[in-house]
Amino acid sequence: MMDTKILVVDDDPNISDLLKIYFENEGYDVKTVADGVEGVNAFKQYEPDLVLLDLMLPKKDGWQVCREIREISAKPIIMVTAKGEVFD
């Protein structure tokens, strides 16, 4: 599975480290970045097969990152957030 690359975009180092450890233990190649601008740039350079994307990010929020990625790719994006309600 090392051919499968996952990009984790999350500003909480505890969450990004946990996801990285979990997916690397399952055999995936994982890259982590901590803000929306880095997320878009890393997507273009790293060319991941899957993106795990936090909603609340510094510099550029998860919705904007998702829109920018969607302009260039249809790769799967899973939104990861601590928000508990739709209206949050």
Spell out what each predicted region is:
Residues 10, 34, 57:
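Conserved acidic carboxylate
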Residues 16, 58, 85:
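The feature encodes the CheY-like receiver
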Residues 17-25:
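Charged docking surfaces used in two-component/phosphorelay signaling
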Residues 27-34, 42:
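Short hydrophobic/Thr-rich beta-strand motif most characteristic of the beta2 strand and flanking loop
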Residues 35-38, 61-64, 69, 88:
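Acidic catalytic/metal-coordinating carboxylates
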Residues 54, 81:
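Active-site residues of response regulator receiver
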